[in-house]
Design a protein with these regions (language model features):
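A conserved structural/catalytic subdomain of Rossmann-like adenosyl-cofactor enzymes
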Residues: 14-17, 21-209
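Conserved SAM-binding strand-loop segment of SAM-dependent methyltransferases
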Residues: 2-10
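N-terminal low-hydrophobic presequence detector
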Residues: 1-2, 33
Length: 209
């Protein structure tokens, strides 16, 4: 067991609630690494019973490959709801395809976070960089202060070096200098050829978010 770690279902029975138990507690910082390829079919209807929390909706369970349900969209909504109003910051691991979604729950969330200027950055990571999934993932960053005028988009998918984990499977890890490059570029919102851009919220809206 881990000190200060609590096991449970944060979507159905969130541990951190307001004193009256009717809403989520809000925090200065929230991070989330949602489970990928896990079957949530048994709890889908329980999650859907909270429409105020899951304002963009709850994805349907696929008839085949139930574990491919886009449950991460619920975790995005949970993170946003858990940010302290006007000051909270958050980050969440998502499938890279989310940021180009043109319909469905994904697009509803994109419109909300762009229209409200909550999202302020996204870093697309190399394949096989996460231990528990081969899915291409990105890290999405939120800032409830709405103080940013641009969103920084970084493509780090071509970075990293291959190695084999303890099971002999090929994985990718970022080198120290690559991590430094990502952090510096993100903080400075720099535009770097073939690596990053900083775009206004209006530009994102015009392109369909």
């Amino acid at each position: 067991s881990l000190d200060h770690a609590i096991q449970g279902d944060t979507l159905v029975s969130p541990y951190h609630k307001s004193d009256d138990g009717q809403s989520l507690r809000q925090f200065d910082f929230v991070v989330s690494n949602p489970p990928f390829k896990m079957d949530f079919s048994d709890t889908r209807e329980k999650i859907a019973a909270f429409p105020a929390r899951f304002w963009a909706g709850v994805p349907k369970v696929p008839a085949k490959k139930k574990e491919s349900m886009a449950i991460y969209t619920c975790f995005i909504q949970h993170v946003i709801n858990s940010l302290k109003k006007d000051s909270g910051k958050g980050a969440i691991v998502i499938p890279t395809g989310f940021i180009t979604a043109k319909s469905g729950i994904e697009n509803k969330i994109l419109k909300q976070i762009v229209d409200n200027k909550i999202v302020y950055g996204c870093v697309s990571m190399p394949s096989n960089v996460f231990a528990n999934t081969g899915t291409n993932v990105s890290v999405l960053f939120f800032d409830a202060s709405k103080s940013n005028d641009k969103v920084v988009l970084i493509d780090a998918s071509k970075l990293g070096e291959e190695y084999k984990d303890s099971n002999g499977l090929k994985k990718v890890r970022l080198r120290d200098e690559e991590i430094e490059k990502i952090v510096t570029t993100f903080q400075n919102k720099e535009a770097v050829d073939d690596f990053s851009v900083a775009v206004s919220y209006n530009d994102i809206k015009e392109k369909g978010a």
